Amino acid sequence: MESNKIFGQELWGTLYTIAKDVKIQIEFNPNKVKEYRLIGYENRMLNNEDFNDDKKDAGEIGSGHTVTAIYEVVLSDGSESSGKVDPLNYQISSVVKSNDIMTLKIRYKKPNQDFSRLITEKVTEGDLKKSENTKNFMLAVSVAEFGMLLRDSEYKGSASFDHVLLWAKRAKGEDTYGYIAELITLVEKSKLLAKL
């Protein structure tokens, strides 16, 4: 099974790059989002000014591969302030009225080009609600929670192996290559080891 995974499904993704120097930038609407935290990627953070710098290297995406960024978000009713950020001295900090939760920007270069292209997408509460019940979302949440448990993250909160299993089993559906079944087995074994 492992050789089929490596040579059958993953080889072409490593041999054939479809995008290089891929960068993702998120801007949350402060009227809708009180606080947020990126889960994972601590070692891959870019400075804000590096997003538009075509000379700054970033990740590559191979054929058939995807990238997932997960944020923990505390929604706001728009009237409160977390009080954690000082006001700006040299910039206007007024908030634009909008129903968007965030703006997603993706910058990438085609493999044979040296200039980047920009994709900008607004995300609404409705968009988020639609994605909450997808199998991909459930799988991503279970993997992120599992990772926080394995490294005993200070942010794990009430995360548990049982919760990871619940979400992973909901995500299973058609598991053509057995990856989700393998995840479930790993979580079950980790749960047993954690009791020792």
Indicate where each model-derived feature is located.
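Conserved functional hotspot residues or short segments at active or partner-binding sites
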Residues: 79-187, 193-195
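Acidic, polar loop-rich interaction surfaces within structured domains
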Residues: 1-100
